[in-house]
Swiss-Prot record:
Family indicated by similarity: In the N-terminal section; belongs to the precorrin-2 dehydrogenase / sirohydrochlorin ferrochelatase family. In the C-terminal section; belongs to the precorrin methyltransferase family.
Organism field: Stutzerimonas stutzeri (strain A1501)
Phosphoserine: residues bearing it: S128
Positions of the catalytic residues: D248 (proton acceptor), K270 (proton donor)
Protein name: Siroheme synthase
Matching PROSITE patterns: SUMT_2
UniProt pathway annotation: Cofactor biosynthesis; adenosylcobalamin biosynthesis; precorrin-2 from uroporphyrinogen III: step 1/1; Cofactor biosynthesis; adenosylcobalamin biosynthesis; sirohydrochlorin from precorrin-2: step 1/1; Porphyrin-containing compound metabolism; siroheme biosynthesis; precorrin-2 from uroporphyrinogen III: step 1/1; Porphyrin-containing compound metabolism; siroheme biosynthesis; siroheme from sirohydrochlorin: step 1/1
Length: 465
């Protein structure tokens, strides 16, 4: 090991930065976050750097570096493009026993800056010893995805109770077991969900020896339109810890595969005129499973609150006192339009956008057609494949031009995506000649014409243009 990792308490202590440019500013920001008092020396200092230093009660010296600038400093940073000056700062600092870092010159450094993942008070540092800083940053980026931002709250909870736990358990082994149970159980889940008061209550009860009750919970998670890369970090974390998964027809198989492998999987999908499981039964099933102490993942395509009946499900949970979390997902309108190269709003074409259900009931759509036919707006119809001819006819009948551009997106954001473009007057006829597979999304408006120059996600699906 070439360098020993240490964490330095810089609160209120003076750090010298030689240099007044962008590199010095980046170092100053990091040091300021650690509570250091900054002394910046350079003939010319950027305004942002001056402002940052003054906000932290530091000092800016508008002149060249002098050896005495190191007096009283616990760390020195050379951040200039003047190599002889950087070498001089390093030499002086080493002679005085002051740790020194010279940017991009590891051979002149007695200390180096790692790549940092900050979940204060939890901090992770990654270093290559200055040999491969880009690699260290790439590893840091991966760690950023593994450690939720809320872990800082969890670490803060541990700090709050540390003294009490130490007083309760004199044995180090007992304390270790206690904290492992906390960090891997429902107390941690409450903290990560932002329910700090509940986490504190449960932790206090655990310290007092109160037997915990089986604490079930429902995670209502939006799975997005299909591409697994569009899942949120929070969604993925909950997917990988649930005991049982209830999933819809619109959830892509690649996303279901990301769920915890030993979790029970229950299909509750619906399709037109065929509800495999009635909604009321789904609601009750969520309540029953959660009251058994299970962590229940309710996985829905798109966003659970946009034509997903998620509101009905959590109403039932709330009525029965079942804890729940809601994780929004990228709704099909946003995801499919973006992957099709169709901006839903545009200053020159559409000043508003409306999301509408295209689901037919008794062969018709009960919609405010006169409002929908107004110009300068984009319409997005969910579940509109079967009702496509009726939708196009009604919009034209109520005043929308038959020449209005329209697009039908099949299985958007996935490798099976196909985009069919035409006009309101011709789209239904074109779709009748194609083998279109649900799920689909219908987009109507002048913005559709922008696809000709903005389409980017094509590949094998280009044949559907």
């Amino acid at each position: 090991m070439e360098y020993l990792p240490l964490f330095h308490n810089l609160k209120g202590r003076t750090v010298l930065i030689v240099g007044g440019g962008e590199i010095a500013l980046r170092k100053a920001r990091l040091l300021s976050e650690a509570g250091a008092r900054l002394r910046v020396v350079a003939p010319s200092i950027e305004a942002q750097l001056v402002e940052l230093v003054q906000a932290g009660a530091g000092e800016c010296l508008d002149r060249g570096y002098a050896r005495q600038d190191l007096q009283g400093c616990v760390l020195a940073i050379a951040a200039t493009d003047d190599e002889p000056l950087n070498a001089t700062v390093s030499q002086h600092a080493n002679a005085l026993g002051v740790p020194v870092n010279v940017v991009d010159s590891p051979q002149l450094c007695s200390v180096i800056f790692p790549a940092i993942v900050d979940r204060s008070p939890l901090v992770v540092a990654v270093s290559s010893g200055g040999d491969a800083p880009v690699l260290a940053r790439l590893i840091r980026a991966r760690i950023e995805t593994w450690i939720p931002a809320a872990y800082g709250q969890l670490a803060g909870l541990a700090k709050q109770f540390r003294a009490q736990v130490k007083a309760r358990f004199a044995n180090v082994q007992q304390r270790r077991v206690f904290w492992e149970e906390v960090f891997q159980g429902p107390i941690a889940e409450q903290a990560l969900a932002g329910r700090t008061a509940e986490a504190e209550r449960l932790l206090a009860e655990k310290l007092a020896g109160v037997a915990p009750k089986a604490l079930g919970e429902v995670y209502l998670v939006g799975a997005g339109p299909g591409d697994p890369d569009l899942l949120t970090f929070r969604a993925l974390r909950l997917m990988q810890q649930a005991d049982v998964v209830l999933y819809d027809r619109l959830v892509a198989p690649a996303i279901i595969d990301l769920c915890r492998r030993d979790a029970d999987r229950i299909y509750v999908g619906k399709q037109r005129a065929d509800h495999a499981v009635p909604q009321e039964q789904i609601n009750q099933q969520l309540v029953t499973l959660a009251k058994q102490g299970k962590r229940v993942l309710r996985l829905k395509g798109g966003d659970p609150f946009i034509f997903g009946r998620g509101g009905e499900e959590i109403e039932e949970l709330a009525a029965h006192g079942v804890p729940f979390q809601v994780v929004p997902g990228i709704t099909a309108a946003s995801g499919c339009a973006a992957y099709a190269g169709i901006p839903l709003t545009h200053r020159d074409h559409a000043q508003s956008v409306r999301f509408v259900t295209g689901h037919l009931k008794d062969g018709s759509c009960d919609l405010p057609w006169s409002e929908l036919a107004a110009p300068a707006q984009t319409l997005v119809f969910y579940m509109g494949l079967v009702g496509l001819p009726v939708i196009c006819q009604q919009l034209i009948a109520h005043g929308r031009s038959a020449e209005t551009p329209a697009a039908l997106v099949q299985q958007g954001t996935t490798s099976n995506q196909r985009v069919f473009t035409a006009t309101l007057g011709t789209l239904a006829g074109r779709i009748a000649q194609e083998d279109v597979q649900a799920p689909t999304l219908l987009i109507v408006g002048e913005v559709v014409q922008l696809r000709e120059k903005l389409a980017w996600f094509e590949g094998a699906q280009a044949a559907g243009r």
